[in-house]
Amino acid sequence: MDITLHLMSVDDKYLLIRLMELYNYEFSAYSNDDINEYGYYGYDHIDDYWNEEGRFPYLIRADGKIAGFALICPHCDYRKEKGARCIGEFFVMLKYRRKGIGLKAVTQLFDKHRGLWEICYWKNNLSAGQFWKKVVEKYTNNHYQTCGTEDNIKTGFTFEN
């Protein structure tokens, strides 16, 4: 399967908003978020991905079809060094999971953006924990550190590539 990343332009903003709703629907099982009175979860930082330096919104395609998205952000939960990056959000649609698409996509992301990385996920999201551990172990050849947030809600990994 051909996996490609496409940097989203501002013209893709409404596509990202729609995909973010799918993501937030699934994520609500962990965050316990509710929809608003208009039937949306919303996402406070959508516009920031086109207005703030260091943010990169990527569309993930599998054989040309939309399969998900990845948002790179400079505001890490744990890592505070200048130039550090984190995966702000990462989503692969259900029909594309467990096929190696997420691993291929995130490997491309790491290769495009060299430097200091932080990957955090909610502790109660066990499938995310399994995915990110596998990705980070494979990508770094087991050269990573573990991290966590002060509120003990998130855990994750840091590394440099």
Model-derived regions: residue spans:
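Short secondary-structure junctions
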Residues: 5, 139-148
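A short helix-loop-beta-strand connector motif used in the catalytic cores of GNAT acetyltransferases and
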Residues: 45-59
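Conserved GNAT-fold acetyl-CoA-binding loop/helix
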Residues: 24-47
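Conserved acetyl-CoA binding element of GNAT-fold acetyltransferases
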Residues: 81-94, 120
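Conserved acetyl-CoA-binding loop-helix of GNAT-fold acetyltransferases
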Residues: 92, 98-111
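A short beta-loop-alpha structural element at the N-terminal edge
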Residues: 3-19
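Conserved beta-strand-loop-alpha-helix junction that forms the acyl-donor binding cleft
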Residues: 119-133, 137, 147-151
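Conserved beta-strand in the GNAT
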Residues: 59, 65-74, 86, 91
